[in-house]
Amino acid sequence: MRLWGLLPFLVPFILLWSIQEPELAEGFFIRTCPRVRVKCEVEERNECTRHRQCPNKKRCCLFSCGKKCMDLRQDVCSLPQDPGPCLAYLPRWWYNQETDLCTEFIYGGCQGNPNNFPSEGICTVVCKKKQMSSWI
């Protein structure tokens, strides 16, 4: 008898489990900021301090070595290299999915995207760990 009482709760999860396109199920799950702990030699300038400071439904997340506005529906490690429009000369690292390696690039100091890490080690911890957990 008790099993039948659970049926109304189980049916939506069974249906979501069978959805072939993950984008269709996005609205059913609350996404949270990535929980990646890294040791930072230098703290980065924060892009935000609160969610409301971020545009387009992005969230203010502690990521890498500073707070960034992040689209929680995006996989950070699949984003392309983006030096941003500014003209600073900051050596940084990004994860290249095609080569499965963290590669150095020059960041201009503003905008860009979150696939932008202060060291090869942090890039590797964030993106290789994420890749390995998706295999499990």
From Swiss-Prot:
Keywords, sorted A to Z: Disulfide bond, Protease inhibitor, Secreted, Serine protease inhibitor, Signal
InterPro entries attached to this UniProt entry: Elafin-like_sf, Kunitz_BPTI, Kunitz_BPTI_sf, Prtase_inh_Kunz-CS, Serpin_venom_toxin, WAP_dom
Localization of this protein: Secreted
Disulfide bonds: C33-C61, C40-C65, C48-C60, C54-C69, C77-C127, C86-C110, C102-C123
UniProt cross-references to Pfam families, sorted A to Z: Kunitz_BPTI, WAP
Signal peptide (residue range): 1-27
This protein's GO CC annotations: extracellular region
Domain annotation BPTI/Kunitz inhibitor: ranges: 77-127
Coiled-coil segments on the chain, per record: none
GO molecular function: serine-type endopeptidase inhibitor activity
Predominant place of localization: secreted
Annotated WAP domain residues: 28-73
Name of the protein described by the UniProt record: WAP four-disulfide core domain protein 6A
Protein source organism: Mus musculus (Mouse)
